[in-house]
Amino acid sequence: MGSVPIAEYGTPSTAEIPDHIEKYLPNYDAILLESHGALTWSADLLSAYHKMESLEFYAEVLYRTQMLGGGKELSGETIEKLYEVRRKMNLPGKHPANL
């Protein structure tokens, strides 16, 4: 899934929310809506659902990690190696991890 940005708060039932998320649509698969919740999208409903399930799982892991004292940040070199593995495996996704 890659990184998940946080969109600026928008008043419910107004154009503020779509205006704030529009810039993220071409480059991301998911977004957190400040003070609202999460949103995922894909070519079909089932794929979008699976992305939401993944996002919720990662959020739970992050929460538990923080409760246990925090995680260890990966080095830039390690992250680049992971991106290279992703490219070699031709994993799909529109997010910035497609370097």
Protein language model features and the residues they cover:
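Glycine-rich flexible loops
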Residues: 1-99
